[in-house]
């Protein structure tokens, strides 16, 4: 990543406010980095932008792996961008418990949406964080709001009933499930069903 001084950081801040996607990606990378200098730079950027956040509609989407979250997001995202909306997708991928790596492959499932000029797609590793999101998802949401995205979709890791943290940072929490999912005992347990605003049968 680029070595930043105050001038470069101020330039980055200005470009994020102008909605430049490359600069937004750099700002999110700074926020997600574990390097101390990057954390210091990120704090500087976020402090400068704290009064610039716009009120975007934030939608969280969860569901078991393979239920079709990415496909649903691309379909919804294309419809929104074609209606003139600016949307950001924050796709959280699981990190390996063995080596800490992450494939970050969700963007490849949104090929059509990734070509839209009004769309920003950012895959991020969860780095072992519980709750379906990463430790810096809140910061990424704030940066997307500053960049002028009207609708922010947060796609969780997709591992099941523990994915509740995203519901606390979004306005609408959607659960995608396949037909005939679960049994009677699962229905009694409820779990994530209790906090879902919308249940989508995909």
Task: Describe each PLM feature range.
Residues 62:
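Residues at the beta-strand->loop junction immediately N-terminal to the Walker
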Residues 1-2:
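Switch/coupling subdomain of P-loop NTPase systems
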Residues 172-177, 192-202:
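Conserved beta-strand/loop subsegment of P-loop NTPase cores
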Residues 187-189:
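Conserved SF2 helicase motif VI
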Residues 8-59, 67, 76-162, 167-184:
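Nucleotide-state-sensitive switch-loop elements of NTP-binding domains
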Residues 72:
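Hydrophobic positions on the alpha1 helix immediately C-terminal to the Walker A/P-loop
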